[in-house]
Amino acid sequence: GTHITAMGADGDNKNEVASSVFAKADIIVNDSVSQCEVDGDTSFAIRDGVITADSPVELGLLIKDDIKRANDEQITLVDLTGIAVQDIIVAEMVCDCLLK
């Protein structure tokens, strides 16, 4: 098993993970499924017919529903295109840590 996090492809013309990798992934996670359908690596995999639009799990549901690998052999793939509110919260946490 392995884990891949893709976070550099934030546009419809950017791609860092081949669509064939999505076909091998047991669990696919997006920070925003609707956004990743249009931008980033997930959009290429959908356009290439390797996965369907309902294949990825949204990050919030992953946490809420406690979705995880069933065994160490599974492959997990996370495609993050960037959500402004998440960036703001992380930046706030970093600033808080720096000011302590």
Predicted regions, residues:
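Acidic carboxylate diad motif detector
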Residues: 6-8
